[in-house]
């Protein structure tokens, strides 16, 4: 199956997981430019999807790869995706970020808050001094950095597809958001959850 199709499978698994866990979820449909008149402008979605959990809105941009890193290339992570996720941080009770799926060697998914992503991207591209434990790639975000700065999305493989425990993820992210006032807090700080 092609990479694009695997990305759609990932989106469908996230959507089904949300429905199974009774989470309000909305997936924004992409416009297929092939169905438009020649020269028609294609609207650009702000996010792939969002979900609502316990008074918080989570705008997500989903990325899937079989590689060990996800490129910063504008073909992969589009400027408007970064722009709108960053803009969403201005509002209370909104936790925006990426869901990065690394399909191989074993399916791993990480939520990376847009602020943590932008900090890493700036350091990586400018080759600045940093405190990351793992190797910094100038042109991509590797799985090791996602493990370090992100929050793992727990999952269970069924016969073919995955169920992602989005309720647990959102509970963890809300606790991290609520503790943001504390000094030196980032989204990769471990927290105890009772979700």
Curated annotation (Swiss-Prot):
User: Which Cys-Cys disulphide bridges does the record give?
Assistant: none
Top-level taxon of origin: Bacteria
**Molecular-function GO terms, alphabetical:** nucleic acid binding
Identification of the protein by name: SPbeta prophage-derived uncharacterized protein YotM
Tell me what organism the protein belongs to: Bacillus subtilis (strain 168)
Which classification does the entry list for the species? Bacteria, Bacillati, Bacillota, Bacilli, Bacillales
């Amino acid at each position: 199956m092609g990479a694009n199709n695997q990305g759609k499978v990932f989106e469908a698994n996230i959507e089904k997981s949300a429905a199974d866990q009774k989470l309000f979820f909305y997936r924004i449909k992409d416009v297929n430019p092939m169905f438009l008149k020649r020269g028609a402008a294609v609207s650009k979605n702000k996010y792939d999807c969002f979900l609502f959990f316990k008074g918080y809105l989570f705008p997500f941009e989903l990325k899937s790869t079989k590689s060990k890193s996800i490129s910063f290339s504008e073909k992969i992570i589009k400027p408007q995706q970064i722009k709108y996720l960053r803009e969403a941080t201005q509002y209370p009770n909104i936790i925006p970020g990426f869901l990065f799926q690394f399909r191989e060697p074993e399916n791993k998914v990480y939520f990376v808050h847009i602020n943590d992503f932008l900090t890493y991207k700036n350091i990586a591209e400018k080759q600045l001094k940093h405190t990351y434990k793992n190797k910094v790639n100038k042109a991509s975000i590797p799985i090791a950095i996602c493990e370090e700065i992100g929050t793992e999305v727990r999952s269970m493989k069924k016969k073919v597809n995955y169920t992602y425990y989005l309720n647990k993820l959102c509970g963890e992210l809300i606790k991290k958001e609520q503790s943001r006032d504390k000094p030196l807090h980032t989204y990769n700080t471990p927290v105890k959850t009772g979700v």
